[in-house]
């Protein structure tokens, strides 16, 4: 049975975010690097570093938090995996869902790489819906 790397990444980020942690370390792979680059570009992450340790590469993520008098308030509200190894979900470019009227993002795996819903609509291509972030 293979590992579901997308689910692992989303779960680690979600758990660290709920716990109020500032930094998270996740195993690096091509798909996780591309998803993390999208999250960084969309403003959900503050910083990303690639770290080599014991023969393996890791990504060290700095989560974005808003500080208040009561403590840090999380920036990422929800991460939801849509496509799973046992059930793949695909969408055409015109039927890509909008999350909260465009406030959230949909991450897709397309023939042009990992893209957000806005980029996929602009290019007019569909693909596998990996996750929703809002």
UniProtKB/Swiss-Prot annotation:
GO terms for cellular component: plastid; ribonucleoprotein complex; ribosome. Gene3D superfamilies: 3.30.1370.30, 3.30.1490.10. Disulfide bonds: none annotated. It comes from the Eukaryota. Keywords: Plastid, Ribonucleoprotein, Ribosomal protein, RNA-binding, rRNA-binding. The keyword Ribosomal protein applies. GO terms for biological process: translation. This is Small ribosomal subunit protein uS8c. It holds the Pfam family Ribosomal_S8. GO terms for molecular function: rRNA binding; structural constituent of ribosome. One of the primary rRNA binding proteins, it binds directly to 16S rRNA central domain where it helps coordinate assembly of the platform of the 30S subunit.
């Amino acid at each position: 049975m293979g590992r579901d790397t997308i689910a692992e990444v989303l779960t680690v980020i979600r758990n660290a975010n709920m716990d109020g942690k500032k930094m998270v370390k996740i195993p690096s792979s091509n798909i996780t690097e591309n998803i993390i680059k999208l999250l960084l570009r969309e403003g959900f992450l503050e910083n990303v570093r690639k770290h080599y340790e014991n023969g393996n590469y890791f990504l060290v993520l700095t989560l974005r938090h808003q500080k208040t008098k009561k403590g840090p308030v999380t920036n990422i509200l929800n991460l939801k995996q849509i496509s799973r190894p046992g059930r793949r979900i695909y969408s055409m470019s015109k039927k890509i869902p909008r999350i909260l009227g465009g406030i959230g993002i949909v991450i897709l795996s397309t023939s042009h790489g990992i893209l957000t819903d806005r980029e996929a609509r602009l290019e007019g291509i569909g693909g596998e819906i990996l996750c929703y972030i809002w």
